[in-house]
Amino acid sequence: IIDNPEITLEANPDDLSEEKIVQLAASSINRLSIGIQSFFEEDLKLMNRAHNAAEAEKSLQLARQHFDNISIDLIYGMPNMSLARWKENIDKALGYGIPHISSYALTVEPKTALAKFVEKGLVSPASDEEAQEHFNLLNETLLDAGFDCYETSNFGKPGYYSKNNSAYWQQKKYIGIGPSAHSFDGVRRGWNINNNPKYIKSIEQE
């Protein structure tokens, strides 16, 4: 293992109680990646997220007290998301002093609640043009705030680029721990099963 490795924990806002964050800060974990996705209740409900808008903000308030290196995920291209509301999402993140943001266009996955809404005509996915406008606004706003777009979907302030994200493009080795986590040994890529109980059972058997 290299000296001073980046050890990132990925979590959702509803996973991060104050007690849990204090425990994480006392461990070897030195980077938090939080799946905020949106600061708006209607977006979170549409994506069927387990957390609400209040929990999203609370998790960042707590995380900032104990971690310096924090990344959040934000989703753009949401149905009915205006540029103004998307800008509010970005501004909220910047207001918390987050040094790294990963942002992805919404993908409507089969058999999800959102897919059913689309099938029934209750919502319409954003057009490619609308999603592009969202990304352009994100890129412009974050560059003005001192971020660099160092990888397609990742923006970081100098010194806060994700070593893990950079490793993908540089073909470096990395280890993923946990359900669905991917690893690369320099030759082959592999990934763990995505079922939590089965993953835990497999560890206990080893």
Mark where each language-model region is.
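C-terminal scaffold of the Radical SAM
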Residues: 1-206
